[in-house]
Amino acid sequence: MDSKYSNDHLFGEFNSSFKALQWHSYEVQGLESNNNVTLLGSSPSTKYQIFKYKNHAYGIQFHIEIKDNTVSQWGCVPEYKKALEDSLGKDALKKFDVKAQENMKLMNFNAENLYKNFKKIL
């Protein structure tokens, strides 16, 4: 998160850096010339990780919601497992699950805050 957007309605209370689940490498691109789009956060793999259009819509290119079986369930889909291994190598599913478990409490905390903030702007 870019700290200059600390007053944002959804993400203003988030730390400037936080953990989230990103499974694939698909991403929104080419928004640089759109003056109505504000980039709120990036990651090493995805420039437009969090963005918003005016004050009407947000784009979030990751999963902030996660359960203890999310990675194992998604890993049952052959295409998903292959995509993960193509990006992160052999045994990626197991390593990814370990990291998800390690960060689950914080990710769930952030998911709850995002939901609370979203309800405030409705």
Residue ranges and their predicted role:
Residues 1-69:
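Pocket-forming structural segment of enzyme catalytic cores
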Residues 64-122:
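Acyltransferase
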